[in-house]
Amino acid sequence: MKKTKGSSFRFYATLLLSFLSFSLSRAFYLPGVAPRDFQKGDPLYVKVNKLSSTKTQLPYDYYYLNYCKPPKILNNAENLGEVLRGDRIENSVYTFQMLEDQPCKVGCRVKLNADSTKNFKEKIDDEYRANMILDNLPVAVLRQRRDGSQSTTYEHGFRVGFKGSYEGSKEEKYFIHNHLSFRVMYHRDQESDSARIVGFEVTPNSILHEYKEWDEKNPQLTTCNKDTKNLIQGNTVPQEVEQGKEIVFTYDVSFKESEIKWASRWDTYLLMNDDQIHWFSIINSLMIVLFLSGMVAMIMMRTLYKDISNYNQLETQDEAQEETGWKLVHGDVFRPPVNSGLLCVYVGTGVQIFGMSLVTMMFALLGFLSPSNRGGLMTAMVLLWVFMGIFAGYSSSRLHKMFKGNKWKRMTLKTAFMFPGILFAIFFVLNALIWGEQSSGAIPFGTMFALFCLWFGISVPLVFVGSYLGYKKPAIEDPVKTNKIPRQVPEQPWYMKPVFSILIGGILPFGAVFIELFFILTSIWLNQFYYIFGFLFIVFLILIVTCAEITVVLCYFQLCSEDYNWWWRAYLTAGSSAFYLFLYSIFYFFTKLEITKLVSGMLYFGYMIIISYAFFVLTGTIGFYACFWFVRKIYSSVKID
């Protein structure tokens, strides 16, 4: 039996939905590194990463605090994304032997001076967490969930210390976590004698260690030795942080066999328990899309069938003059807007951001940008932004040529430099603030130079290549002729005033994404993993459709009011959703974050301005192209003498 077109479509639609369902229901990813097999007794080297805090958002090098240092500190080779995230991966004194439990090992003994005491206390006040890595797995603290269930969750890193008071005293003291109890989970290969690491947990403790006589080569502690089985007892005295005090850093390690396979070892870190919220968000957004789709369908039916057929049947000039609405402005609707060059720049930049976002999400859906590939997401976004410059140049030049613009080189330079120039200016100010705080989040000179090389050496030339290709193409022709004398725009009702209609237009696109936005902001500012790109991709598609449809609907109402200045209005209508995004970021700052430092607050709002600006350019471009297609469609269907 011959397969029909309809059945073919249903087959491919089913295939697509099956793939999306799999992507949504599973933490689907490709591990970023090849598995390593360990034999019993093989050395395991723990690496240390940055100190991080959700209260300050300022990462610091692990050895900024007076922790135990190896004889020579070696920096791990970091990719571009890791450097931009503030990661500083280095070697440490913590070494294990595979499958060999070690009850107590002494790391070092340090004496606190004024500076180190001050630094420890500041980091305890700001709730800093120390981060470590073993076989590319970050260390985590196992916690009971707060919802009362028996399930557990992972907290990334461990607290530097805590504040408390002795029994019978109200004076608050600072205590440091100087003893780390590590637990390494492994999965044994049944065919060979090797094992693979599938988990890395830590339980931090504060212990005031005691010893009779300190032997640097073989220190013997009375509170901790190789025969100790249970270190932590009810009467253990915690280690206080005070100038002049000695701190002995110790650790122990145990190994536990796990049923988790190496390919699934990241699942516990990526465990998401909010699927119902995401589905509710998507269903809610789809209802908005269906409502808007109905309106667009009615408009298209009316304009392309009823109105156009009636309009084409008009024979006398008197009948034509009696017509009102969008048909009357056909001689002005394609008149180039004010600041047409600037509009071309923003549309070209929006295409660049759209291409970067789409390809990044496709790579993430396929599993190439998993958290195990540390810094991969950030690196991919930067590189894709650079290579999408060719589409920015092409889009802006095509529009510029249609507007009969001149000085194409100036136009191309604006496309290449305006948006990234504004971003770099804000970025430089923020980076200077981070430098002033001596944070490892400050971008080093070498990385900054590499970013400039990517911008000037690859992105700018590609914008010129795209612009050259665009200008070589014949100009886009208007479906109707433009009158020499502009038509006067009649007085508009209050609800069609530009400010009101633009602000109204941004509500629905923002409403389509704001629940997913909460999870994205949480992952950025509360140091959590975000890896539900299946949901994000669906929300992105809904955002595209919502921006397009709301712009088309409001553009139609505008043309019916005989206002033909739709070019910038279309861009700003969808782009105004960024205004609500920034308002939401203010709400999020005051309700979800505990940032108290001025510098940290400036960093937050600086980065949110960058995100909101990029969102404005992206959504504005989507709305503009939808309206551009709509206007050309309806006026190309009308016969004009």
UniProtKB/Swiss-Prot annotation:
GO terms for biological process: intracellular copper ion homeostasis; intracellular zinc ion homeostasis; monoatomic ion transport. It is a multi-pass membrane protein. The chain crosses the membrane at residues 279-299, 349-369, 375-395, 416-436, 445-465, 500-520, 532-552, 570-590, 598-618. It comes from the Eukaryota. Residues 28-278, 370-374, 437-444, 521-531, 591-597 are lumenal. It is found in: Endosome membrane; Golgi apparatus membrane. A motif (Golgi retention signal) lies at residues 639-641. Residues 1-27 form the signal peptide. GO terms for cellular component: cytoplasm; endosome; endosome membrane; Golgi apparatus; Golgi membrane; Golgi trans cisterna; nucleus; plant-type vacuole. A motif (Endoplasmic reticulum export signal) lies at residues 630-635. Residues 300-348, 396-415, 466-499, 553-569, 619-641 are cytoplasmic. Pfam families: EMP70. Ubiquitous. Highly expressed in the root elongation zone. Keywords: Endosome, Golgi apparatus, Ion transport, Membrane, Signal, Transmembrane, Transmembrane helix, Transport. The C-terminal KXD/E motif functions as a Golgi retention signal, certainly through the binding to the COP1 coatomer. Belongs to the nonaspanin (TM9SF) (TC 9.A.2) family. May play a role as effector of cellular copper homeostasis. This is Transmembrane 9 superfamily member 7.
